[in-house]
Amino acid sequence: MKREKKEQVVQSVTEKVSRSQGIYLTEFQGLSVSRMSELRNEFRKAGVEYRVVKNTLVKKALSDLAGADRLAGALKNTTGVAFGYDDPIAPARVIKKFSKDNESLKFKMAAIDGVVFEADQLGVLSEMLTKTENIGRAAGIINNVIASVPMVMNAVMRDLVSVVDQVGKQKQ
């Protein structure tokens, strides 16, 4: 590969890294071409971009990223990079599901919002809620709190009326 082409690849990967909420490194050594096509289709369905890039070029593209040194340590053998643009957890779910049936696909490492996740943390990553799901849960909790305020106020008023009524009956 000529120098200009390498620079273009580094620039392209750097741009993808800057747009991504989550970056995942995988090893796919021993994965057949048909299985690799299946994997790419699964990633595509989940809104994830998956690229195979030379390790040295990925290392250069990740150099400005928080945790780049740790990620660079995982750049050995064949490396595929998954970019989660809208959902940083989507690649983890695809990798976990696909690797159950395909032992040739291995999760190496991930970086989400500057936090680096090791290979043994794939299960935790894949079970995390998305931002949208977390926002929905928070909105539900806030809604429940807001809805319970009038009930509490009504209970206080009802109790006050009951006390006044009892005092009135005792005075008669």
Swiss-Prot record:
Coiled coil spans: none
Gene Ontology cellular-component annotations: ribonucleoprotein complex; ribosome
A Pfam family recorded for this sequence: Ribosomal_L10
Gene3D superfamilies per UniProt: 3.30.70.1730, 6.10.250.290
Biological process (GO), any one: translation
Record's keyword terms, sorted: Ribonucleoprotein, Ribosomal protein, RNA-binding, rRNA-binding
Listed GO MF terms: large ribosomal subunit rRNA binding
Protein family membership: Belongs to the universal ribosomal protein uL10 family.
Function comment: Forms part of the ribosomal stalk, playing a central role in the interaction of the ribosome with GTP-bound translation factors.
Subunit annotation: Part of the ribosomal stalk of the 50S ribosomal subunit. The N-terminus interacts with L11 and the large rRNA to form the base of the stalk. The C-terminus forms an elongated spine to which L12 dimers bind in a sequential fashion forming a multimeric L10(L12)X complex.
Listed name of the protein: Large ribosomal subunit protein uL10
The organism of origin for this protein: Chlorobium phaeovibrioides (strain DSM 265 / 1930) (Prosthecochloris vibrioformis (strain DSM 265))
